[in-house]
């Protein structure tokens, strides 16, 4: 019988695992830290080991070989998953079962090892879902926040180069023009004076003065805050305002285009008709009676040699004529 595919690296892992366990056993205390390091790399198999202990309890199965085979199947599945990089868990399970078949010759131990591979599969799937949930994802509003941050940086850099100042032009009595130019001054809210700690030395007049001073300072601060609140809000949210303005402009342009196309007059030019058809339509509209062919009188004149035209025929009143 041919060996399953991938049996060489499985044998290498099976041979390497006892060596690692022996090294950790000889190390004593540091072996626990090494085992934890391997668990973090290969994956935690404690849940699978508990499932094996519930399946093969020692009071029901006095032999420990089947329990160890089941726990070894859990570890083999973790090793196969580490080698395959967890791409396909079904393939990892098949490789784990083939490794169990090569490692154990008895059917009971093979079944226990296969059961360990099967028990580790749902825990591996859960770990993959947890790793996928930890991956960073882009939020839908990330482009808008990026535009806002870029716009705020541009505005900050522009404000650093632009210096605002007040300029006044006054004309003196002698006719000279005097120019006063000053930079804006920053007004800070006056700090509240701290009340003295010794209440015995403080007087009522000083307390009333401090209260009046604090109320006046608070009122001035609120007035300054109300005046500067709108401008500060505009400066902080300038990126959002620009973005909304662009979006609304595009929507208005689209609406104007659609409304123009929907309400436009159809440019239809009727084809010109011949005059004979126009005469027939005029006759039909006026409801005129047509003369029969028998009531028409045809007058013919003989052709003469000279070029001058002959006299016109006499007018005949058809109403007084009888044919």
Swiss-Prot record:
Glycans are attached at residue 90. GO terms for cellular component: Golgi membrane; late endosome; late endosome membrane; lysosomal membrane; lysosome; plasma membrane. A motif (ATG16L1-binding motif) lies at residues 263-281. Residues 260-323 are cytoplasmic. Disulfide bonds: none annotated. It comes from the Eukaryota. Residues 36-238 are extracellular. The chain crosses the membrane at residues 239-259. It is found in: Late endosome membrane; Lysosome membrane; Cell membrane; Golgi apparatus membrane. The keyword Transcription does not apply. Keywords: Autophagy, Cell membrane, Endosome, Glycoprotein, Golgi apparatus, Lysosome, Membrane, Signal, Transmembrane, Transmembrane helix. N-glycosylated. Residues 1-35 form the signal peptide. GO terms for biological process: autophagy; positive regulation of autophagy. Its main location: membrane. Pfam families: BSMAP. The keyword Ubl conjugation does not apply. It is a single-pass type I membrane protein. Belongs to the TMEM59 family. Interacts with ATG16L1 (via WD repeats). Acts as a regulator of autophagy in response to S.aureus infection by promoting activation of LC3 (MAP1LC3A, MAP1LC3B or MAP1LC3C). Acts by interacting with ATG16L1, leading to promote a functional complex between LC3 and ATG16L1 and promoting LC3 lipidation and subsequent activation of autophagy. Modulates the O-glycosylation and complex N-glycosylation steps occurring during the Golgi maturation of several proteins such as APP, BACE1, SEAP or PRNP. Inhibits APP transport to the cell surface and further shedding. The ATG16L1-binding motif mediates interaction with ATG16L1 and promotes autophagy. This is Transmembrane protein 59. The gene is TMEM59.
């Amino acid at each position: 019988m041919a060996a399953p595919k991938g049996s060489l690296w499985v044998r290498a892992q099976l041979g390497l695992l006892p060596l690692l366990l022996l090294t950790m056993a000889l190390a004593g205390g540091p072996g626990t830290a090494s085992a934890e390091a391997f668990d973090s790399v290969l994956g935690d198999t404690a849940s699978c080991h508990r499932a094996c202990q519930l399946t093969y309890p020692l009071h029901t199965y006095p032999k420990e070989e089947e329990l160890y085979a089941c726990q070894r199947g859990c570890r083999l599945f973790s090793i196969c998953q580490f080698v395959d990089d967890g791409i396909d868990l079904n393939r990892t399970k098949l490789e784990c079962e083939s490794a169990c078949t090569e490692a154990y010759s008895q059917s009971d131990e093979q079944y226990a090892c296969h059961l360990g591979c099967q028990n580790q599969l749902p825990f591996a799937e859960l770990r993959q879902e947890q790793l996928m949930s930890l991956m960073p994802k882009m939020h839908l509003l990330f482009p808008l926040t990026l535009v806002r941050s870029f716009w705020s940086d541009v505005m900050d850099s522009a404000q650093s180069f632009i210096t605002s100042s007040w300029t006044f032009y006054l004309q003196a009595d002698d006719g000279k023009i005097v120019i006063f130019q000053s930079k804006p001054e920053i007004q800070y809210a006056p700090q509240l004076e701290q009340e003295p700690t010794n209440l015995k030395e403080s007087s009522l007049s000083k307390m009333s003065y401090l209260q009046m001073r604090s109320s006046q300072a608070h009122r001035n601060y609120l007035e300054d805050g109300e005046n500067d609140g709108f401008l500060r809000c505009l400066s902080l949210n300038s990126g959002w305002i620009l973005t909304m303005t662009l979006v609304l402009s595009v929507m208005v342009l689209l609406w104007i285009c659609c409304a123009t196309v929907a309400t436009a007059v159809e440019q239809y030019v009727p084809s010109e008709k011949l005059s004979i058809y126009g005469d027939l339509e005029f006759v039909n509209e006026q409801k005129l009676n047509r003369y029969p062919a028998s009531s028409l009188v045809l007058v013919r004149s003989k052709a003469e040699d000279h070029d001058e035209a002959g006299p016109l025929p006499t007018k005949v009143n058809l109403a007084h004529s009888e044919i």
